[in-house]
């Protein structure tokens, strides 16, 4: 997946907002490996249907840490790597792994049918949830999360891939958005942050 200027700008905006939120406490280093966005006014809820047609909200996962990633099933690298790392972290956390909920939001509803999405997330963990809205719903949700995505023409006529923000949002057990973890941070860093959030309650 090509990293475009717009994608870098999108990541920069998230990082910039995180810095603004922590400006009043700049002297105290963050305990997290990811970007601490506690108190952010964006990324508040999902409100998209799952593969069974049930509309899902962050609030229903109360008591669990929720890791939300926007991607597409035909993504060759970032998406499967991100989901695999999350599955590995969930397993490595043992009993605490049951308190981690992975949510995959499709940015390509034209190709990602409910059947395709259901099979895709099941490859990583039977507990993971996949969400798929209409084109308009997807656009609106991505905007609420400050997630950038766009079609990129493929090598053959009519084909395309997707360019998108490469990172996940982490919600604490009370349903509040807390972290933005960039792609490439690694499984160990994610495990550290999830365990810390659970410890904090």
Q: At which residue positions do the language-model features occur?
A:
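A short beta-strand-turn-helix
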Residues: 46-66
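Hydrophobic beta-strand anchors of alpha/beta hydrolase catalytic cores
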Residues: 67-68, 102, 168
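Thiol/disulfide oxidoreductase modules built on the thioredoxin-like
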Residues: 137-193
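N-terminal export leaders
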Residues: 5-9, 13
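C-terminal motif of bacterial Sec signal peptides marking the signal peptidase cleavage site
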Residues: 20-23
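Structural microenvironment flanking redox-active thiols in thiol-disulfide oxidoreductases
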Residues: 81-141
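Bacterial signal peptide processing site
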Residues: 25-28
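Short active-site neighborhood of thiol/selenol oxidoreductases, capturing the structured segment around
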Residues: 59-80, 86
């Amino acid at each position: 997946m090509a990293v475009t200027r717009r994608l870098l700008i999108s990541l920069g905006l998230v990082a910039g907002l995180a810095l603004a939120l922590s400006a009043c406490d700049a002297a105290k280093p963050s305990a997290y490996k990811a970007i601490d966005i506690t108190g952010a006014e964006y990324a508040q809820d999902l409100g998209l249907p799952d593969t069974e047609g049930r509309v899902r909200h962050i609030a229903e996962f109360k008591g669990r840490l929720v890791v939300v990633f926007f991607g597409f099933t035909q993504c060759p690298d970032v998406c499967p790597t991100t989901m695999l790392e999350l599955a590995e972290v969930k397993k490595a956390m043992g009993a605490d792994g049951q308190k981690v909920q992975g949510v995959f939001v499709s940015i390509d509803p034209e190709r990602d049918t409910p059947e395709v999405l259901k099979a895709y997330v099941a490859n990583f963990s039977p507990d993971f949830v996949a969400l798929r809205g209409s084109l308009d719903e997807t656009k609106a949700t991505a905007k609420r999360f400050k997630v950038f995505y766009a079609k990129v023409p493929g090598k053959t006529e009519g084909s395309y891939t997707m360019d998108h923000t490469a990172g996940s949002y982490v919600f604490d057990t009370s349903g509040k958005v807390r972290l933005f973890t960039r792609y490439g941070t690694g499984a160990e860093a994610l495990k550290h942050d999830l365990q810390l959030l659970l410890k904090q309650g």
